[in-house]
């Protein structure tokens, strides 16, 4: 007989109840199914309709193409940082933003773990080399903010390194903004059952299974640790120069369209169609740590 498959069942406490979750079981537990959208006090009980989403997104993507023409004509620079828990929808939001932009002038940066050489450098150094030049739009799928979340939670940095990061980051970002880079920082926030449902979907899908790692499974039992680090990060790195934009992302469709609206409304580009952009849903998108309180 072959080696017995490793069990990946975890025990987690949600809402004061101890739950057992086996990600390898093809059946999603009822307690997850019931709250996969409403988890974390999400303000809607239904997802945005597909037809409404498709029409809205297309109009917003037309505006993003205008932004790119404006960047090339003026030499302006835009940089957007996408952060959030695992399975928060960062990649999908980036794709929706980037889909129709010219890849010569719009880049997605998704760095792997640092090399031995990079570990010996100044922490920010490997990120700075990817910052935009004149006319570019750069989107970071995770960023230097790894040091505010996953690294301290999983023990990949020391407490002193984490503390120093929270002090140094506002100074660095202030320099970027003063150098006329348009900097956007997005935190995509999801509920606990939402994350579990998305992990389960990845595990059961032959097309998405590569997205799920053992570290993701380990993170299921560290929800409160990640929450504490999230709150500390938002509190200490939300500044007038480089504010955090928080997006409730249980519904990926609402998250994406409101995130893109925020970018478009903040930029003074030629041909801007205010009616096509529409209004931001203030139940979905807000500013800084107070939005989650």
Swiss-Prot record:
Keyword Kinase: yes
PANTHER family reported in the protein's UniProt record: ADP-POLYPHOSPHATE PHOSPHOTRANSFERASE, POLYPHOSPHATE:AMP PHOSPHOTRANSFERASE-RELATED
EC number: 2.7.4.-
Catalytic activity: [phosphate](n) + ATP = [phosphate](n+1) + ADP
GO terms under biological process: ATP biosynthetic process
Entry's family note: Belongs to the polyphosphate kinase 2 (PPK2) family. Class I subfamily.
UniProt name for this protein: ADP-polyphosphate phosphotransferase
GO MF annotations, alphabetized: polyphosphate kinase activity
Coiled coil (residue ranges): none
Classification via Gene3D superfamilies: P-loop containing nucleotide triphosphate hydrolases
UniProt function note: Uses inorganic polyphosphate (polyP) as a donor to convert ADP to ATP.
Keywords recorded for this protein, A-Z: ATP synthesis, Kinase, Transferase
């Amino acid at each position: 007989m072959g080696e017995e498959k490793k069990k990946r069942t975890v025990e987690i406490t949600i809402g004061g109840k101890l739950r057992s979750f086996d990600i390898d079981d093809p059946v999603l537990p009822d307690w997850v199914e019931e709250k996969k959208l409403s988890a974390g006090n999400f303000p809607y009980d239904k997802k945005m309709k597909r037809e409404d989403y498709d029409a809205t997104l297309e109009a917003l993507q037309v505006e993003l193409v205008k932004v790119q023409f404006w960047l090339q004509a003026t030499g302006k620079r835009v940089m957007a940082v996408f952060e959030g828990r695992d399975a928060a929808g960062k990649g999908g939001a980036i794709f929706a933003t980037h889909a129709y932009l010219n890849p010569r002038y719009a880049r997605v940066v998704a760095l792997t773990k640092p090399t031995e050489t990079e570990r010996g450098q100044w922490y920010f150094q490997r990120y700075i080399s990817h910052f935009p030049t004149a006319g570019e739009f750069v989107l970071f799928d995770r960023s230097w903010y790894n040091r505010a979340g996953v690294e301290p939670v999983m023990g990949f940095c020391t407490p002193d390194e984490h503390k120093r990061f929270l002090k140094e980051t506002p100074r660095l970002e202030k320099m970027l903004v003063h150098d006329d880079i348009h900097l956007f920082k997005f935190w995509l926030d999801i509920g606990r059952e939402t994350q579990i449902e998305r992990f389960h979907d990845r595990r059961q899908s032959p097309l998405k299974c590569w997205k799920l790692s053992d570290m993701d499974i380990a993170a299921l039992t560290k929800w409160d640790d990640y929450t504490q680090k999230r709150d500390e990060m938002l509190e200490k790195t939300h500044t007038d120069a480089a504010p955090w934009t928080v997006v409730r992302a249980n519904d990926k469709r609402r998250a994406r369209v409101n995130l893109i609206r925020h970018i478009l409304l903040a930029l003074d580009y030629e041909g801007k169609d205010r009616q096509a952009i529409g209004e931001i849903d203030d139940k979905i998108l807000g500013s800084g740590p107070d939005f989650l309180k």
